[in-house]
Amino acid sequence: MTTHEERLRDTLKTKELIEEIVGNNKDAFEYLKMLCRITRTLDDIYDGDNENLSREEVLEIIEYLFITLPTNNFFAIHQDVLISQHLSMYNAWMAANKRENGDEIDKIYAHVWRDNIFEVFPIVALLIGGIDHMKCISEKIRVLFKKELGE
């Protein structure tokens, strides 16, 4: 379980990285921001580890899923590429949840799989700025979001 301070720190790091990825593309910024918010909130609901989660926050996520995300211009233009990443994120997250209490090897894999959401960042970077931008962002996420086992 992350602390409130850790969540604030992680949110700031993520926002700064998203700004670097998207430049002045407001739709791409909103897309990544929504995706992070959705996955964080759904993980909190699944784990039951955020007692401060409000009904309004849950409704916000429902609105994102049913209205705001599907009508986001960046997503609409690139959904053929992005949907496959959404499927991969979901699949990895489910596998991580299933194996997080398994043997030592399961726990190592779960530790890595749970952060699969960040793999969409280099894809968005590619769509906006090309392969060199993708490679740069790919390296940054591996450094920025690296955690000790068990964190």
Residue ranges and their predicted role:
Residues 1-151:
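All-alpha prenyltransferase/terpene-synthase fold signal
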